[in-house]
Amino acid sequence: MPAGICGCCGALRPRYKRLVDNIFPEDPRDGLVKADMEKLTFYAVSAPEKLDRIGAYLAERLSRDVMRHRYGNVFIAMEALDQLLMACHSQSIKPFVESFLHMVAKLLESGEPKLQIYGTNSFVKFANIEEDTPSYHRRYDFFVSRFSAMCHSCHDDPEVRKEIRIAGIRGIQGVVRKTVNDELRATIWEPQHMDKIVPSLLFNMQKIEDTDSRTGPPASPTTGDKEENPGILAENCFRELLGRATYGNMNNAVKPVFAHLDHHKLWESNEFAVSCFKIIMYSIQAQYSHHVIQQILVHLDLHKKDSPRIRAGIVQVLLEAVAIAAKGSIGPTVLEVFNTLLKHLTLSVDFELGDRRSSAGSAVFSSSSTRESDERIVQNAIIQTIGFFGSNLPDYQRSEIMMFIMGKVPVFGSSPHMLDTSQLGDMGTKRIQIMLLRSLLMVTSGYKAKTIAAALPPAFLDPLLSPSLMEDCELRQLVLEILHNLIDRHDNRAKLRGIRIIPDVADLKIKREKISKQDVNFMKKHGQQLYRHIYLGCKEDDNVHKNYELLYTTLALVTIELANEEVVIDLIRVAIALQDIAITNEDNLQMFNRCGIMGMVAAYLNFLSQMIAVPAFCQHVSKVIETRNMDATYFLPEVIFRDKCSLPKSLDKHEKNQIFLTNKIAESLGGSGYNVEKLSMPYVPQVTDEDRLSRRKSIVDTISIQVDILSGSNTEDKVNTEEITFESLKKAIDNTGMEEQEKEKRRLVIEKFQKAPFEEIAAQCESKANLLHDKLAQILELTIRPPPSPSGTLTMTAGHAQYQSVPVYEMKFPDLCVY
């Protein structure tokens, strides 16, 4: 029978069509006919093979009603489809689903907001249905595109616009839930889909950042907020998406975030960028954190030539990311993070110096100075990131990072891994040194090693105490502060703050333990390095109050943490040597520096005498301090480091009772069982190869002079010069007298080698050997030059003046010289 005849006669139409037609009332406002809907549902459940036909017929009616704007019938058809979906769970539902999705697509394509919202709601209901066997051929490309477009709705009515955006976000959430649960269906993670989904969510999240900036772990908004606020709904959808991402999909989920922030220029005012990456870091699985950090580092490399504020924004995001990642797993990216940050630190310094050089030749300074300050922002952000990341690492990794950063500091004789600053010049090298030491200071903060040898291995200590890091006041301060972080294992530094004469050290409640055997061995091997650094640091003429305070704290911390009886004697020798520097003034220091050294020595010896609790020593120190209080207050730290302190014109007229005397100290300590033989030998710092090649002012000359004038005399023992007479000359010529003098010299040499410590003997021999080598080098340089021409003429070769040698037979000698 022809189909047309069946269409005219209702009784001859298929039963499923009659059942579908019966659910539509004459007046659409009456809604779905429930009795007939129950019949249709029973029929669909009883004959599931008819589901595909039912769905196709409903889709046909819905398409016709949409075209004719019969929206009442459209809503009835969608309600019927929803009920059939919820009631039927069989293999035959798959063809029916295709019809259902086709009808949802029709609604989403319409320009009517109500239909779009209704279609989205139906799709969300479908997404919440768990299918027994998922259909792998089904794709959701259209729905991803359409829901993403709805998230960017620009409808004129604000309320309608808000409803459409909420519907779009809920639709994306439905697509995500429907697809990401199945590991075999990974189409949703493809870049073409993520490039639509993620920016759509970020676009709506951005709308609430101005009024509500959420940080930390995922929030728990109320159900009402989720439904009414597109921003909160988008954020929860974003968290859910990231929480379902695997390692292979992480890159596709994070890359669109970078693209969105770049496109909308959100790095400079980076509150939203920071918020986004906090959400990312808290939402993803902990073992994937290092992958996100890698992506941020790659993005930072891509923007290395952009404006400073953009780079600073990216670094700030990195700081927030590593702050979260450092608490969990950070994978193999630890050194990569630091290496990349140090590279960008060098670039920033290079840009800053380049702008400074370019502005020096022009008359306009405003733009260049602004860029300089922006580069400082980048540098500070990098340092904060390095420090925060390093300080949150476990101790075993932190020690590696300390070595890694120290290896990058440009110093003499450092490792080949140090940063190349040859293109930056002296100023750039100094800036890099300061930046790296500031980073190192933050990394070492709170680090507690069991032994000082573990905290200060030779590979770390040698470059840290290098004279290359003593050329600037700020550099020396940073080095001392790093030493404080590593030496102070009992948190005593805060109690020592402020250089002063402490009346009773017991009131400070210093925490102290018995020095371990490992620490004793460390001081035997490296104690001379520490003493030398303190000694030379006091002699710098650009020292300020902070330098002396840090030097005092260093001496005090060494006393607390590392001092046994032998170290105490060495520290006293260093203190007396510093006092001699101020009194003799061989380095031509300013009066403030000389008085500052005297005040620092007074504060330290007062502290030391009370720490070792030798009554006679304490009495001598107290007596000197009382005398200074009466007659020489400028030798006390509380006075000399006070603002507008009046300085003396000279120190030539100082009294003997105003200074600390070696013989008095030796007597007091000797009576308490200390071995004071070393106190008779003045302290002399070691000379290193770097000193000889250093560009700094005469470290070698200063030390060499002290080596040459070594004698048993101290500040209080003045040797009278011998009066030269005819008789004394006769005795000098007499052979017997010469033999006695030789015997005396040999006796003194033997005594010195018997009593003096090995380090001092080695320092003296090394300094003299270095001087001898320098003299020999000068002599050899003179001897290998060709003899000058008798006429004194010069010849120019390749722009260089050269003397031409004349054969002997051509030389003209004076007549008196010719035989």
UniProtKB/Swiss-Prot annotation:
Pfam families cross-referenced by the UniProt entry: EFR3_ARM
Region named Disordered: 210-230
Classification via SUPFAM superfamilies: ARM repeat
UniProt PTM comment: Palmitoylated at its N-terminus, anchoring the protein to the plasma membrane.
Membrane topology: Lipid-anchor
Signal sequence segment: none
Keyword vocabulary terms for this entry: Cell membrane, Lipoprotein, Membrane, Palmitate
BP-aspect Gene Ontology terms: protein localization to plasma membrane
Organism annotation: Xenopus laevis (African clawed frog)
Similarity field: Belongs to the EFR3 family.
Protein name: Protein EFR3 homolog A
Compartments where located: Cell membrane
InterPro entries hit by this protein: ARM-like (IPR011989), ARM-type_fold (IPR016024), EFR3-like_ARM (IPR049152), EFR3_Homologs (IPR051851)
Cited function: Component of a complex required to localize phosphatidylinositol 4-kinase (PI4K) to the plasma membrane. The complex acts as a regulator of phosphatidylinositol 4-phosphate (PtdIns(4)P) synthesis. In the complex, efr3a probably acts as the membrane-anchoring component.
Complex formation: Component of a phosphatidylinositol 4-kinase (PI4K) complex.
UniProt GO cellular component terms: plasma membrane
Main location, first listed in the record: membrane
